[in-house]
Amino acid sequence: MTNNKFKSGFVAILGRPNVGKSTFMNHVMGQKIAIMSDKPQTTRNKIQGIYTTENEQIVFIDTPGIHKPHNALGDFMVQSAYSTLRECDVVLFMVAADEPRSTGENMIIERLKKAEVPVILVVNKIDKIHPDRLFEIVADYTSQMEFSEVVPISAKQGNNTERLIDTLSEKLDEGPQYFPEDQITDHPERFLVSEMIREKILLLTREEVPHSIAVTTDQMTRDEETGKIHIMATIIVERKSQKGIILGKGGDMIRKIGKMARRDIEIMLGDKVYLETWVKIKNDWRDRKMDLADFGYNRDDYM
């Protein structure tokens, strides 16, 4: 690209769990790169989505929802989210219009007051409220701190997201193109495969199971005869009872997880996939630093 006024920068998306951060980024990217579910703490790692046009490259960093951690994995997730404040050029503080400001938001606001970059308040899920309520919601948040801009959106419906992109572009300085124009994320395919499998477990299971699992993609090879991509993945659980839930009666659940995940993986890779999944028990892995690092949650990466 030869544009003397090409703009670029890194934009962190911060907020409590389930305010729509991943939904927004997937909408902007035009395809799924961050998994979504109705479970809190669905996003565990920082996910970078790369939005490129002729005039700009915006690298979005979708962070884990900020919450009060209850184990070492939770500590990792919160540390990962806050570490983006040291790396970004702009912060999007996303809140849900249909939920009142909570102690969680107040905690984030106190951190954001110390930020040395512009902070934009993004009021998401405006499709769920009456328009008359919007002024009241914005007034409540702006009474807590000064934001450089306020942009109401509906990430699910795409309302006002273009305006938010334009606002971000105005805040960014001229800069280089960090990634090739056809690259939409910095994560390797194996990570995305693991996340798509984990998403289906989040959708299909309940209670403690969704938060107690990790997924690793152990092997990805192409079968030269069939052209299919052979993927071997391991689902890690903390208890024998959880393994039984993941497997299901007669293997029904593990087959359902595999079928749903394979569909998304094939769309992402653009190839037919043979997916083989195994279930392994690792007692209390969420509180073991070595296990966390093995499964891709290394806290030292964000210190």
Swiss-Prot record:
CDD domains: Era (cd04163), KH-II_Era (cd22534). One of its GO terms (cellular component) is plasma membrane. Keywords: Cell membrane, Cytoplasm, GTP-binding, Membrane, Nucleotide-binding, Ribosome biogenesis, RNA-binding, rRNA-binding. Residues 124-127 are annotated as: G4. One of its GO terms (biological process) is ribosomal small subunit assembly. It holds the Pfam family MMR_HSR1. It is found in: Cytoplasm; Cell membrane. This is GTPase Era. It comes from Lactococcus lactis subsp. lactis (strain IL1403) (Streptococcus lactis). The gene is era.
